[in-house]
């Protein structure tokens, strides 16, 4: 259904709380994975986000995604389609240990069927 051509993880250890993500760490990770995989940031059309639905974490994550792959830093032009972002957690809730594989399955099926799954608000 799809090929995973790159992945990565990081942890910078510097944020005001254990559950608060770091914009800098997320932005660096998104950029590094593209570079390591030989994919231009402008070629990213969809991001399956962590998207836990927190008031602090989601804005930080979406800002990093927008800066890494979107128009805000000139990665895309004004006439280019936007980067689509979603998270399976809006459909299923947080699966804790299984949430990563559920995200991969959802994204694989979306690519295979060429259809976007709507996010439940």
Across the structure, where does each feature detected by a protein language model lie?
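Condensing-enzyme catalytic core of the thiolase-fold
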Residues: 1-121
């Amino acid at each position: 259904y799809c090929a995973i051509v790159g992945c990565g993880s990081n942890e910078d250890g510097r944020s005001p709380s254990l559950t608060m993500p770091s914009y800098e760490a997320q932005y660096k990770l998104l950029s590094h994975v593209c570079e390591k995989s030989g994919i231009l940031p402008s070629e990213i059309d969809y991001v399956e986000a962590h998207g836990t639905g927190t008031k602090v974490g989601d804005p930080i994550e979406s800002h990093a995604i927008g800066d890494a792959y979107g128009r805000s830093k000139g990665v895309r032009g004004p006439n280019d389609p936007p980067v689509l972002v979603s998270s399976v957690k809006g459909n299923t809730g947080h699966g804790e240990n299984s949430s990563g594989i559920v995200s991969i399955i959802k994204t694989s099926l979306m690519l295979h069927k060429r259809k976007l799954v709507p996010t439940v608000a």
